[in-house]
Amino acid sequence: MRRLTDSFILGLAKGAVIPGLYPFRMTEGRSSLEQIGVVITVAISFLLTFKKFDPRFYKPIGDFKIVFLSLMAAKLPSFLSAVVMICLIFSEMRLRMILSRCVLIMPSYSPAVFTGMMVSLFFKSQMFDDYSVLTTTAFLLPFTLRYGWMIRSSGFLISLQKYRPILKSTSFREVDLKYLVKFTVEFLLLFTILWIGKIFLSMPKSNHLFFLTVVNNVFFKLNVFKAAACAMVAILSGLMMNVCLYRIIFEAFLGLGFSSIMLTLSSDLKDRSFYAGDLLNGFFCLVVCCMYFGV
């Protein structure tokens, strides 16, 4: 029962933290230079998550406070708001990195994690925009309070011994280069189709919560190339008939393609000596950046 509860708590927190969501919203109507500045900030904060880190000594209360105060201050004048958003993105990236590692390191139930994420994502819909500060902090609070007990569990400490930081010199020697090339090609294919869809389907400004839910699917996998082909058919159909249904179909198949890659990475690399959680976190952040930037 405790494992089930902890898994649900991790899912709530993962769904509440979408790195870059609020900073990318700030780029609407801004100059190209300002947009480039946001992307650079996101990239730097992402790279900093790869530094040497021991989850046993992490205290999430610091990032929790920053996220809460940053969201509270989001309506400040533009310059101050930009400074606040920089602080927010750094904390979001770190929280997401911690959560990605914990989900893989700690014994957890994937369906419970997914259910928690769906609950959090539902409350990020536009009907709850006025309560975004309340809902985000409410879903992060259980993880913040529970983290200390989680990492002291025997299962966590035993599993932690298998892992080393991703930048260890011996980490990538254990991975077949052809294996990484295959995933890189699949990443690039889906990212290219995503940008094509954004250009030709006139995707509206929204939270894309349906897409994010499908991306985090843990129940079944679809061949990436089949998913890409179906997404292209949806784009062509949307060009001929401007119906929102095709945008939904496009996001569904594209999300299934991304989730298939993440599921394969999670299952194949989980027992390797480096943090598969770092790869999954980086992949998710790239997907968010590609989907939200410039929409």
Curated annotation (Swiss-Prot):
Keywords: Host membrane, Membrane, Transmembrane, Transmembrane helix. The keyword Transmembrane helix applies. It is a multi-pass membrane protein. It comes from the Viruses. It is found in: Host membrane. Its main location: host cell. It holds the Pfam family Herpes_U26. One of its GO terms (cellular component) is host cell membrane. The chain crosses the membrane at residues 33-53, 66-86, 103-123, 131-151, 183-203, 218-238, 243-263, 274-294. This is Protein U26. It comes from Human herpesvirus 6B (strain Z29). The gene is U26.
